[in-house]
A protein has these predicted regions:
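Hydrophobic, well-ordered secondary-structure elements that form the walls
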Residues: 344
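Short, composition-biased local secondary-structure segments
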Residues: 261-267
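Surface-exposed loop-to-helix/strand elements on domain peripheries
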Residues: 242-245, 267-341, 349-357
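Structured, contiguous alpha/beta core segments that scaffold functional sites
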Residues: 2-78, 86-88, 93-99, 103-261
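General structural feature for long, well-ordered alpha-helical segments within catalytic domains
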Residues: 222, 250-254, 295, 340, ...
Length: 357
């Protein structure tokens, strides 16, 4: 059991126990009171391009707020990301001693396993860590440390929004809390920091959601166009006829009656005026549906590596192809799990082992 007031952190530097009793962000009230900007509202291609350029230049806030909006507003992205994230979160886990472990090492691994089992929110921690799969990185803060039955354990582990951080570039890119002069380094034994790149490069460009932003935007346009199409072409045209010499007030009364019929299927008009219903205009919504389907297939390919575990079109969805795509999903799950295990071993298991060693 650690009894000294100083121990060595993962960087080899001395760490005082009183420094980790409270969360690092406890005094950063400005971050806690921030309200998201929701950049998806009124998003256009030019605004999106500008937002992505700003992220590459160091201002990542709007990009990661957009990522949050995408997962919240696009049901297909939410469903596919949920499949991938929960495929990892539902796996069984264990604390495994090293190869050719001594009896003492095996005993230590078993003790660590019991301590980890005592974390009430560990399943939630695993799920929140997988937030990095879509966004490139995810940070969870220890809400300080406390003694539980004589052992040091985190009070709670809280997911923090990616918009709280900045990604200064150097010899090695870091994740830091937003602030002046390049931000504030994350406190040792204070964070679980998981990095999950979808492609090589700087973190602000390597997130999976960077691939999904354009299909998301195109799909939004197509959904809006389809809604407008259905509104125009799916409702019978209503024409009102007023007699020669009708006053402006009478014309306005007729117009209001037409509007009421469109929404309430009821209305009144003055005697002598007429209402005619024409057939709905003819049109084909297939073009809009085709674009929406293309966007969703692209999203599924990017997230799950294929489409046949998500959608069946009755044409290409054979059992053999479905099995192939399911194997791809398993490969992704296993790769995700390896990255997750490495992060949790470094940022959660190791601190618990050191503080209770």
């Amino acid at each position: 059991m650690v009894t000294m007031t100083r121990i060595l952190g993962p960087d080899g530097q001395p760490l005082r126990l009183n420094e980790i009793r409270e969360p690092q962000t406890a005094q950063l009230t400005s971050l806690h009171h921030e309200v998201a900007g929701h950049p998806s509202r009124g998003l256009t291609p030019s605004r999106l391009a500008s937002l992505l350029d700003s992220a590459e230049q160091g201002d990542i806030v709007a990009q990661y707020e957009l990522f949050e909006d995408m997962e919240e507003k696009d049901g297909h992205i939410h469903a596919e990301m949920s499949k991938r994230r929960r495929a990892v979160a539902q796996l069984d886990w264990d604390i495994v001693p090293p190869d050719n472990a001594t009896a003492k090492e095996k005993e230590a691994a078993a003790a660590l396993y019991n301590l980890m089992q005592g974390l009430d929110d560990f399943e939630e921690v695993i799920f929140d860590t997988t937030d990095a799969i879509g966004k490139g990185f995810a940070c969870q803060e220890f809400d300080g440390w406390q003694r539980v039955d004589g052992n040091w354990l985190p009070k709670a582990i809280i997911h923090r929004p990616q918009s709280w951080f900045q990604l200064p570039r150097g010899v090695r890119q870091e994740i830091r809390l937003r602030g002046p002069s390049g931000g504030t380094p994350l406190q040792p034994f204070g964070w679980i920091t998981h990095v999950h790149k979808s492609k090589s490069g700087y973190l602000e460009r390597s997130a999976l959601f960077r691939v999904l932003v354009w299909p998301y935007l195109f799909k939004n346009y197509s959904v809006g166009d389809l809604a407008e199409f259905l509104e125009i072409y799916g409702i019978p045209m209503r024409v009102g006829k007023y007699p020669t010499g009708a006053t402006e007030k009478e014309k306005l009364t007729l117009l209001r009656a037409l509007a009421a019929l469109g929404h309430n299927a009821a209305g009144i008009i003055p005697l002598g005026m007429e209402l005619d219903f024409l057939n709905a205009a003819q049109g084909d919504p297939a073009a809009f549906q085709l674009m929406i389907e293309w966007c969703e297939r692209t999203q599924s390919k990017a997230i799950l590596g294929g489409t046949l575990t998500s959608q069946a079109d009755g044409k290409t969805s054979t059992n053999a192809l479905g099995n192939v795509h399911n194997e791809v999903r398993k490969d992704l799950r296993d790769a995700d799990a390896k990255l997750l295990a490495k992060t949790l071993s470094r940022d959660l298991v190791y601190p618990i082992a050191v503080l209770n060693g």
